[in-house]
């Protein structure tokens, strides 16, 4: 009797799942394609413009540090021990300052990138929600899927819906 009940439940579950999947509308979004969209590229350009002046200043400071190091190496034999020590410390302090400013710039860029990507992800999620409601999707999945039919790939719709 127990075997019959288990078999009955198994068959019923299989029939129910086959019937349920026939009514399920599924969509797929390829996030790598979304992240290569014009909207995502605009974020990169915006951040580049925002931080370009600081990056240029750091490039100039790096050139100055390198020039001073080169001059110090070249002129070190002509300097007194005290002068050499003072100039070496000066160059070392400049190099430390440069490294600190580079770290700060990297941190600031990462913070702003995370802020902008969160806004972008919110726009993507909003577009997905609008498309899901409008087109009657029951399930929309992102990324790692073994196989995706072109008929359920809604990536282009999502990209078109971002920011609307």
Regions found by a protein language model. Give the residues of each.
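Repetitive helical segments and hydrophobic/amphipathic motifs
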Residues: 12-15
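N-terminal signal peptide c-region/cleavage motif recognized by signal peptidases
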Residues: 17-19
